[in-house]
């Protein structure tokens, strides 16, 4: 039995009509149009594995910025209130923990919990750290950087979460 071997670029041109990727065979090669249209890919082939792109967007997305003057973490926590969040600094790490007990929604009961841990740069002034929650559910953790050679004051302490009434100015990813 003869099997025709096709060049990969030929299969890619037929991508939306003939998905050639099974079980992440081409992992790391980027996203194509049919990766962003999950309803189309599931109707074409029952063996085609859906992209993980959607699950990444549904999880709490965070962004870390560190420039010359300050260190900032943006974290989407829209399902949590300030009372559900705990922000703590231990040594060179900031730990953000969110948990709310079981609540009833349209489909039954739901509970959520997450734990994030970020390494702080060594030159962040830990005595001037702040944390706020915007009206649209974006948690902003920030701290100024100090000139090198000065003591950053490493200790364990809790950072209170304040609520802001305006939406976040963080870029949407």
Curated annotation (Swiss-Prot):
The modification N-acetylmethionine is found at residue 1. GO terms for biological process: lens development in camera-type eye; negative regulation of apoptotic process; protein refolding; response to heat. Glycans are attached at residue 162. The modification Deamidated glutamine is found at residues 6, 50, 90. The modification Phosphoserine is found at residues 45, 122. Zn(2+) 2 binds at residue 107. Acetylation at Lys-70 may increase chaperone activity. Undergoes age-dependent proteolytical cleavage at the C-terminus. Zn(2+) 1 binds at residues 100, 102. The modification Deamidated asparagine is found at residues 101, 123. InterPro entries: A-crystallin/Hsp20_dom (IPR002068), Alpha-crystallin/HSP_16 (IPR055269), Alpha-crystallin/sHSP_animal (IPR001436), Alpha-crystallin_N (IPR003090), HSP20-like_chaperone (IPR008978). Keywords: Acetylation, Chaperone, Cytoplasm, Eye lens protein, Glycoprotein, Metal-binding, Methylation, Nucleus, Phosphoprotein, Zinc. GO terms for molecular function: metal ion binding; structural constituent of eye lens; unfolded protein binding. Gene3D superfamilies: 2.60.40.790. Transmembrane segments: none annotated. Residues 153-167 have a biased composition (Basic and acidic residues). Residues 1-63 are annotated as: Required for complex formation with BFSP1 and BFSP2. It comes from the Eukaryota. The modification N6-acetyllysine is found at residues 70, 99. Zn(2+) 3 binds at residue 154. Contributes to the transparency and refractive index of the lens. Acts as a chaperone, preventing aggregation of various proteins under a wide range of stress conditions. Required for the correct formation of lens intermediate filaments as part of a complex composed of BFSP1, BFSP2 and CRYAA. Belongs to the small heat shock protein (HSP20) family. This is Alpha-crystallin A chain.
